[in-house]
Amino acid sequence: MSLRDCQAWKNAGLPLSTTSNEACKLFDATLTQYVKWTNDKSLGGIEGCLSKLRAADPTFAMGLAISNGLVLVGTGTSVALDKDLALAVKTMVELSQTQTLTPREQLHVSAVEMFAKGNFPRACDLWEQILRDHPTDMLALKFSHDAYFYLGYQEQMRDSVARVYPFWTPDIPLNSYVKGIYSFGLMETNFYDQAQKLAKEALSIEPTDAWSVHTVAHVHEMRAEIKDGLEFMQQSEGHWKDSDMLACHNYWHWALYLIEKGDYEAALTIYDSHILPSLQASGTMLDVVDSCSMLYRLQMEGVPLGQRWQTVLPVTQKHTRDHILLFNDAHFLMASLGARDLQTTRELLTTLQEASKSPGENCQHQLAKDVGLPLCQALLEAENGNPDRVLELLLPIRYRIVQIGGSNAQRDVFNQLLIHAAMTCTSSVHKNVARSLLMERDALKPNSPLTERLIRRAAAVHLMQ
């Protein structure tokens, strides 16, 4: 892989304010691994590259922006929780004010600063400003893509890439990966055919592109194409299993097909062999939510989980007071409820309530009162056997849950929760809710074995008449 030096970045119309060729190449190496979702051992992994990058030029603004940005976009910590990170962001901003940076670099620094404050929409505006003038700025494209994902801004996630896609000609490094990034936004906005076509194009150029594999997995999931999905994951596994940052999530998609089929043993085997080990090795947020989401789905299906929640709890417990993403919070709560840890549950809910009272410019804390807290409360009520209360909490906000971010497939766990609650509620006010929700689900995703199972169960207790 030929990494770009100072001159190469300049030639690309993306000059970097450093005289160190080494720093420029390490910036490229870090960016490449981020885009590929893979820590490349031959490059020393992202961590290795970042520490060498800091050594090569400690005041390199774009080096600091990618370094701080990656930590923040990981959503495993924040400036409120980590003093070193807070200092690193502050130092980055101060250094940028003493240097003569290009307007593009200055915007990058400001965007990371905004993201650090929890103001994701403003950060995205700044990244978009960069992309208008520099459509091949991959860092702005990827950071904004991730932030839109956290915001549940699905159209923006798609259109952000549509606006720059024509500029990514085959001679530009990483150009095929832009197809995969674009395909994901298309898929999340229900352009399934177009999404699949682009993802397959990307895979024909670079078969190890785990994010494009991930788009195809989503398309099969959303269309309930279980057989095709399973075949695709089996055939492509050799290509994506070494993408250490996304392999666990692709295995999660594989397991979703098995849960859909009702093949719970096979799903648990994937959980035990791939998802849990990945969680224990990395502790990254994506691996955490994959574990919690999968166990919760199996639990709703009545599958005995043994001590699996207790194994996840030590990882989620550390993040009880984080409140970085409401989507993450809801999944941490699943773990403390599943492990019957009342103290952690209470702590998560009380500290989230506190955060919602003085949100400042933090978009997640602003959303906590109307969406995050009712959603978390609904999980608690479900655990306490109060299905009517679950419906009272979730029905008014069900079309707002998208605002907590995540994908349609990931948030489907909350649709399933609502249906399960509706099937066991006793209030006459709610008597036809289960039927309505099941009809809607069947219309949107026909031939889903999971939906068919739920309809059979509902019909057996006369809820479908």
UniProtKB/Swiss-Prot annotation:
Keywords: Repeat, TPR repeat. The keyword Cell cycle does not apply. SUPFAM superfamilies: TPR-like (SSF48452). CDD domains: StaR_like. TPR repeats lie at residues 104-137, 176-209, 248-281. The keyword Signal does not apply. InterPro entries: TPR-like_helical_dom_sf, TTC38. PANTHER family: TETRATRICOPEPTIDE REPEAT PROTEIN 38. Belongs to the TTC38 family. This is Tetratricopeptide repeat protein 38.
